[in-house]
Design a protein with these regions (language model features):
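Short, surface-exposed, charged amphipathic helix/loop patches that serve as local interaction elements
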Residues: 1-91
Length: 91
């Protein structure tokens, strides 16, 4: 799924105004591993499906970029991306 961003960002040395979320490459095993990493980093915090921090971690994996790149997006772009992940996780 390609998402058009409002701003441009330097991601992996390239200037981008889109992000590609490849949910098809995400397996259940990988999703559980991302969840474990999230809980470890956040001292066991419960993962709510609408948790933006968890959604950002999933988005970074699906896009093949660093989580910090997602976290550096503008509020609007961050919300757009994490909302798409949340919709996917709820489907």
């Amino acid at each position: 799924m390609e998402i058009k961003l409002e701003k441009t960002y330097e991601i992996n040395g390239e200037i981008k105004d889109t992000i590609e979320l490849d949910f098809d490459k995400l397996t259940g095993r990988q999703l559980i591993q991302i969840e474990r990493e999230f809980k470890k980093e956040n001292k066991g915090e419960l993962i709510l499906v609408a948790n933006n921090a968890f959604a950002a971690k999933v988005a970074a994996f699906c896009a093949g970029i660093k989580e910090d790149d997602i976290l550096d997006f503008s509020g609007k772009d961050f919300t757009t991306v994490t909302t798409e992940v949340t919709v996917f996780l709820n489907s």
